[in-house]
Regions:
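Short catalytic/ligand-binding loop motif for oxyanion handling, primarily in non-cytosolic enzymes
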Residues: 20-23, 28, 77-79, 86-90, ...
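Donor nucleotide-activated moiety binding/catalytic core segment of transferases
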Residues: 97, 104-129, 133-137
Length: 165
């Protein structure tokens, strides 16, 4: 088992839209559909979220999120998630960190909270990104990494199994 693990690529797993349901939580917090929320001004969009200092730490699991985490957890995955700029929402980084400590018990040295554009910097031939945002996947692949565009847990697990997991 240990030998096999060394040869498998490192898994980087996104949070929002993969493990936790940001959209559902944002709809609950703002009272508008995610489609409508997307078209609001920056302050209308983020105001109610910023006002709730527990927003990030109390996001619900994504449907299939626990199942996916249970599958990948034995491979010592890293979290690679984007944060909202600290000046804009100072609760984001500590809130996401708390969510991870509470829900997945991932060690701090495997938590990478970065600007969205920095995700591609983690790419190499021995790394996989699981992400629900296609641009992150294409940027990661351009840098030589393996990308799994997350549309469902069953599909992502199928893709991981094809890679030898």
């Amino acid at each position: 088992q240990e030998n096999t693990m060394k040869q498998l690529p490192r898994i980087y797993c996104d949070m929002d839209g993969v493990l936790c349901d940001f959209k559902k939580h944002a709809e609950k917090e703002t009272g508008v559909s995610i489609a409508k929320w997307s078209n609001l001004s920056k302050s209308e969009k983020w105001g109610p979220i910023k006002e709730n200092r527990y927003f990030w730490s109390t996001m619900p699991w994504m449907a299939g999120g626990k199942q996916l985490w249970n599958f990948i957890s034995m491979y010592k995955p890293h979290i690679l998630s984007a944060y909202v700029e600290e000046s804009f929402d100072p609760n984001c980084i500590p809130g996401k960190t708390k969510w991870l400590k509470t829900n997945v018990q991932v060690p701090t040295d495997r938590i990478n909270l970065v600007r969205r554009v920095q995700k591609q910097n983690f790419a190499n031939k021995n790394s996989i990104l699981i992400d629900d945002y296609n641009k992150n996947i294409s940027d990661f692949k351009k840098r030589g990494g393996i990308g799994i565009y997350h549309t469902s847990t069953s599909n992502t697990i199928r893709e991981l199994k094809k890679l030898g997991f």
